[in-house]
Amino acid sequence: MGVLFGLRDNQRVMRIVLIVCCFFIFFGFLVHPRVPSLSDTWHTTAKHDQRKPLVKPEDVIVSGLIFYGRKSRVSSMRCYLERNLVDNGGWLDEVLWIVNTENKDDLSFLDEVIANNPKRHKKVIAQERLWAHTYWKAWRHLERGKYYVKIDDDILWIDDDAIPNMVTRKIRNPETFVVSGNIINNPPLGFMHYRMGALHPYFPEPEEPTYVTNGTEYWKPSQHGFWDGPSSFTWDIERKPPQYKNHRWLRVEDERMIYQTPVAKLKYEIWETSYEAWSIATQMHYSLLENIENDSLDLYKFDKPWTMYEDRIRINFMCVYADDILDSDIEHWPKNRGDEDMIVLDLPKDLRRRRLSSQSPLPLLTVGSAAVVIEGNALAAHFQYMDQKGLGGTDLLKRYRALAEDRYCLPNGGPSKQ
């Protein structure tokens, strides 16, 4: 009998142990998503981030700096500039337009923009057409003590908090030379966006449609239906675009087919295919429109700055402090170097050398990372590089214009209703 009672007691203890173990396992599953790993050094921004809006310091002057040439692009960008003016609750005290065109229609459009708010918009007419090795002349117009947000004229979309986030990062980190935005269609960021899950499967529609929706929601991918084709279909990135004008790319319903789409060829590279392929850029743009529609911009964002060290980043959308540029003796920049070469490669490298030789009190890691960083929460979309000519045959310019009118343009240029 004693043996039997002993067995029962052992069984009772085993049951209690099993119950306790199950409880802790279950509790662990509940808690784990809420407790980040101590070794986790990279955190994407949570969806519906509830951080308080950034407040512009009273003693800070922020100027937009735009190298202007094309009405077809700026007709969309104009809405985002208006949203970001201090008059409308934004951070831009002024916008400086560097005119680099002789086209009468383009010039007339810019005059219209400036006339709408001459207090905030200023025009500088270059004495000659500027190109890669003469853009340095535009940087002479910076004024000391100001922060400048340089915006290419084919930036077609700017997230509402992008400029505040870039400028704040620069203010808080004065040793950083350049703060770049997290830009759609700016290698090598496309590779990162792909690996972070921000890009989706799209293919060009197989033939010209007989009817296309043309309402205010034209920009939304959901309004155009799914792509219809064989599951084995692929699109060679060297393939030319469809021949008809304003062709569409449509969402592929099967997510698994993304491996057959152009973005599957993305690499962490500055030039080559990731830079040249119009089809990759096209797919990135349509993916952005989908993410805006689905309120999924968190897919692109990250909190820790991405340091470029001595890698190039294109200067499509970035923040600099005027004194940092003016102290570099712009007039004597090497004549065989473009402004991008100087601002994101040569000047930061020289700055690091000077700090190291002067025995700067800054930690070595900070000195090494003082060059160029990506602000992961400053999203913007850059339309096109010269090698991406096929983009012009898509309906993307039309879609970005529809997006601006539907979501971002202020009524009569008035204050934001946010």
Please provide the spans of the model-predicted regions.
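Active-site-proximal specificity loops/subdomain of glycosyltransferases
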Residues: 97-150, 156-164
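Long, low-complexity intrinsically disordered regions enriched in Ser/Thr/Pro/Gly
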Residues: 66, 93-96, 111-112, 116-122, ...
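C-terminal catalytic/acceptor-binding lobe
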Residues: 3-45, 56-58, 77, 232-418
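Short, well-formed alpha-helical segments that are part of the catalytic scaffolds
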Residues: 46-51, 70-88
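Short alpha-helix within the catalytic core of nucleotide-sugar-dependent glycosyltransferases
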Residues: 145, 156, 160-172, 228, ...
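Short loop->beta transition adjacent to catalytic acidic/histidine clusters or analogous donor-positioning motifs
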Residues: 58-62, 85-96
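Conserved donor-nucleotide/metal-binding helix-loop-beta segment in metal-dependent transferases, i.e.
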Residues: 158-211
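A conserved hydrophobic helix/loop-capping motif in glycosyltransferases and polysaccharide synthases
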Residues: 62-71
